[in-house]
């Protein structure tokens, strides 16, 4: 129970006793640093129902609390704010109550509540994962873990875009230029090999366009008449017709990609419970179009195409079925959402982790599903996020200059290795221990740098800055965790028992207060779908711990009771760091 939850009934009782008025809600905020207090009650809303001035009202309530509530030590009133100082005994009791809770702040899933399905990654099978996919995967995975910790049952899913003209481009280029090359013969990961032929297609396509332009064609005509694009379109038609040879090639090359993706996901530390494939879902939703027509949600134009008119909602008309009866992406997404609830009947909401260029698409999708009458449609959320840039500029795709996810992770590990070696504290480590540490630091730096930023904001990712061992970075927090583990290893006495301590040092109290916030931060992060709240809370906790570490003796404290309490407090901080970082998918090293 939080401090505000503890104080609310006591303040409501005080108002009832003192003024014979009942109030439903008490407003709290964090006490400003320049004032004494641990929590602040806002007085102004009460002036609507109680005839008094803020100072008199605050003093009367404060006096009542000091006399009747054991947790309240003293108070002060500044303007319309009642600053409440909480007794040390409250914080000692709180700490003793949570000291041995291994997953403090985490809630078990409520069996009465509906589950949430979180979709992320959802790549195309024609190239490797890139930097944009890294942000997508890290956000989706982290939000799924945060929702779990907040007490939700969660399914992690992705829909793999394994069909369409872009897939046929890689297939055709491999057929033309590949000479039977395989991942084994080329020593390339399967996704990289297929991506190589996507680039080869684009090069050949551009060459043919230029040749046609030289013969007098316009660029527009050349793009349509280039022989290689016509061949790719013919291959797509064969795929749709179930041509055995094309399907066999498609399956073979897709499997190469899946094997490559699996390695990337393992290295990135993300996973999935359920896979969907566009080749299985692209026909879904067409049957729903008729339902929508019958309900008057959709309307049919004279040419036979089917639309939805969302102009009353501030949007426009959106096509859901072409005049030739073929589906559009919107139709597929409608059908896939419905299919997911059929597959997992306990799902009551979905989170779609997709870039902000699709904001409009998801507004329309969610509105359509609501209008079709699905009760779970009100619990759909688009986890929209901004582009990731490197200092050298934006990512590109077809020219082969994309920032590859595997290369990025390796670069981060190499950067961590260079910085760690420069610091020169790894003499006692074996080669394997060093390699594991470099990866832990490098990936921790990458993940933290990306996740500490509000998802909606664009990121300029600076690899060197992210691996800094000072400031708001993953390695700084990992180093603090490792420092605490060192303290615990050196504590050559029993510090397991509950300690009764009369008075807390100011830094001890501030640290316990920071720990106390963790459950509320998890709930806020879940409600806002924001790993940034977890990341920045963890940084604040670590800053508070380092201030404590600099201000008091821990193992050097002469008073055994204080020494035991400070080791226990350090241990709890480490546990919260580890728990918080687990929600971000970041590992913490036991020593650094």
UniProtKB/Swiss-Prot annotation:
It catalyses: tRNA(Arg) + L-arginine + ATP = L-arginyl-tRNA(Arg) + AMP + diphosphate. PROSITE patterns: AA_TRNA_LIGASE_I. It comes from the Bacteria. Its main location: cytoplasm. It is found in: Cytoplasm. Its EC number is 6.1.1.19. A motif ('HIGH' region) lies at residues 123-133. It is an enzyme of class 6 (ligase). GO terms for biological process: arginyl-tRNA aminoacylation. One of its GO terms (cellular component) is cytoplasm. GO terms for molecular function: arginine-tRNA ligase activity; ATP binding. It holds the Pfam family Arg_tRNA_synt_N. Keywords: Aminoacyl-tRNA synthetase, ATP-binding, Cytoplasm, Ligase, Nucleotide-binding, Protein biosynthesis. Monomer. PANTHER family: ARGININE--TRNA LIGASE, CYTOPLASMIC, ARGINYL-TRNA SYNTHETASE. Belongs to the class-I aminoacyl-tRNA synthetase family. This is Arginine--tRNA ligase. It comes from Flavobacterium johnsoniae (strain ATCC 17061 / DSM 2064 / JCM 8514 / BCRC 14874 / CCUG 350202 / NBRC 14942 / NCIMB 11054 / UW101).
